[in-house]
């Protein structure tokens, strides 16, 4: 039997971290077995479902590299099929019309809660054909004896007594089918063999299994993934940082790091931390996913992100860095190749957003220096080293790191001063701040005439400081 998994988000918001992990696990199960991964948009909630949310989900999936083999399917395009099967259940007396008013149901629930009972439908219309009215819902006739048992890949054997389950509404008063019914029909029609989803769906599972059996459909295998917590042990929310997948793109994370991190968020393979996508496909097993909730650790994600920025081919990272520069309005058409910037800066930052922020001097002119760095290093004592450095740097005919370093060394030797007396003022002059990679390779990526002009700007700053 070919394995078919699915990811079935509701388009009522962005693709959040928990949903992305579920999608990844489903994708890995399919790819490991040479099966198919189906994308289904569960948009029956017409009031809350939006096209921007659908677009955000698709964008998030594409950014993570979770390509789907079939779909996206939309539940709102399948209402005829749902109605066909609802009619079938009605004809076979496996479903019935319920005319109970909202007032009656509310009163019933209040009385049940007052008596310390779990609120549930009391079956008033189940076997009462004389009840009538203009408005009705359709309820599934749930079995009243026996139990539903399924072996969850993550949680083991789970059993629900049918007496705990009331008769589920499968069609609303306006005729639209409900979530639990649509899911069942879709999983059947799309040949889904493995359902991977959040633990909040565990209570839906016995109801869905009963409907599947009533329809004569095969029952898929289930795996319910635990929730993701913040580092304080509470449910992950915006106060813990980004929860939208695309927010991580915006914040400068590479998709390889996010995929690696999400895979490890509740799953492990020995003590290995770094996984290529091929390794994830090879090693991932649902049975190895933890039952316990996982805590989101931003520091761990940052560590992974820096690892991937340093180890991925620079040409693969460069377009993502370009996107970050675009967001802050930096024109990179005049300046070094972004691959060079990536190689130079990757071990100095945790995100591409930080990399773009500290690399503006490669592409933009500036007329001010970092206040703290200038105060410390652009003092009158720095005037002579800067003048000498400008002279020797200006004499270079082949502008490269080796010749630049030789000029810096010669400046220090000619003035009989330590390298710091030359290097730090020159760094502030050339980059505008006190932090940069090694000065020789940094200056190599800045045009020679630009470096000389910036030294003049620094000398002017020192002169103004002396005259102040």
From Swiss-Prot:
Its cofactor is Zn(2+). Its main location: cytoplasm. It catalyses: tRNA(Glu) + L-glutamate + ATP = L-glutamyl-tRNA(Glu) + AMP + diphosphate. Keywords: Aminoacyl-tRNA synthetase, ATP-binding, Cytoplasm, Ligase, Metal-binding, Nucleotide-binding, Protein biosynthesis, Zinc. It is found in: Cytoplasm. Disulfide bonds: none annotated. ATP binds at residue 238. Pfam families: Anticodon_2 (PF19269), tRNA-synt_1c (PF00749). The keyword Nucleotide-binding applies. GO terms for cellular component: cytosol. Binds 1 zinc ion per subunit. It is an enzyme of class 6 (ligase). A motif ('HIGH' region) lies at residues 9-19. GO terms for molecular function: ATP binding; glutamate-tRNA ligase activity; tRNA binding; zinc ion binding. Its EC number is 6.1.1.17. A motif ('KMSKS' region) lies at residues 235-239. Zn(2+) binds at residues 98, 100, 125, 127. The keyword Mitochondrion does not apply. One of its GO terms (biological process) is glutamyl-tRNA aminoacylation. HAMAP family: Glu_tRNA_synth_type1. Belongs to the class-I aminoacyl-tRNA synthetase family. Glutamate--tRNA ligase type 1 subfamily. NCBIfam families: gltX_bact. Monomer. Catalyzes the attachment of glutamate to tRNA(Glu) in a two-step reaction: glutamate is first activated by ATP to form Glu-AMP and then transferred to the acceptor end of tRNA(Glu). This is Glutamate--tRNA ligase. It comes from Idiomarina loihiensis (strain ATCC BAA-735 / DSM 15497 / L2-TR).
């Amino acid at each position: 039997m070919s394995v078919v998994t699915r990811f079935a988000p509701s388009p009522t918001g962005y693709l959040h971290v928990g949903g992305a992990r579920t999608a990844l696990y489903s994708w890995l199960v399919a790819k490991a077995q040479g099966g198919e991964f189906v994308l289904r948009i569960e948009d029956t909630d017409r009031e809350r479902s939006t096209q921007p949310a659908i677009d955000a989900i698709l964008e998030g999936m594409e950014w993570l590299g979770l390509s789907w083999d079939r779909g996206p399917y939309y539940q709102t395009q399948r209402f005829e099929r749902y109605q066909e099967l609802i009619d079938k259940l009605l004809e076979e007396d496996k479903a019935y019309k319920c005319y109970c008013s909202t007032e009656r149901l509310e009163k019933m629930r209040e009385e049940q809660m007052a008596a310390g009972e779990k609120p549930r439908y009391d079956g008033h219309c189940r076997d009462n054909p004389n009840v009538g009215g203009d408005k009705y819902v359709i309820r599934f006739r749930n079995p009243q004896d026996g139990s539903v048992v399924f072996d969850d890949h993550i949680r083991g054997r789970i059993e629900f007594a049918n007496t705990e389950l009331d008769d589920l509404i499968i069609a609303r008063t306006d005729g639209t089918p409900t979530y639990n019914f649509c899911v069942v029909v879709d999983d059947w029609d799309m040949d889904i063999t493995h359902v991977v989803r959040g633990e909040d769906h565990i209570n839906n599972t016995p109801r869905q299994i009963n409907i599947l059996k009533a329809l004569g459909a095969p029952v898929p295998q289930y795996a319910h993934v635990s929730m993701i917590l913040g580092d304080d042990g509470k449910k992950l929310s915006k106060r813990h940082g980004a929860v939208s997948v695309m927010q991580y793109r915006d914040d400068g994370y590479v998709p390889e790091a996010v995929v690696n991190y999400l895979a490890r968020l509740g799953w492990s393979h020995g003590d290995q931390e770094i996984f290529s996508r091929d390794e994830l496909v090879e090693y991932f097993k649902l049975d190895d996913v933890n039952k316990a909730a996982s805590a989101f650790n931003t520091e761990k994600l940052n560590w992974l992100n820096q690892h991937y920025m340093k180890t991925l081919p620079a040409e693969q990272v460069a377009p993502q860095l370009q996107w970050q520069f675009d967001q802050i309005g930096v024109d990179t058409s005049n300046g070094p190749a972004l691959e060079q910037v990536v190689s130079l800066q990757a071990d100095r930052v945790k995100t591409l957003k930080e990399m773009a922020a500290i690399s503006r001097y490669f592409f933009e002119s500036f007329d001010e220096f970092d206040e703290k760095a200038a105060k410390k290093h652009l003092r009158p004592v720095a005037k002579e080293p800067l003048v000498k450095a400008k002279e020797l740097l200006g004499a270079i005919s082949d502008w490269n790191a080796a010749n630049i370093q030789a000029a810096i060394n010669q400046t220090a030797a000619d003035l009989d001063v330590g390298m710091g007396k030359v290097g730090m003022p020159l760094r502030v002059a050339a980059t505008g701040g006190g932090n940069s990679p090694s000065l020789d390779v940094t200056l190599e990526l800045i045009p020679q005439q630009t470096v000389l002009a910036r030294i003049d700007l620094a000398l002017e700053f020192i002169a103004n400081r002396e005259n102040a």
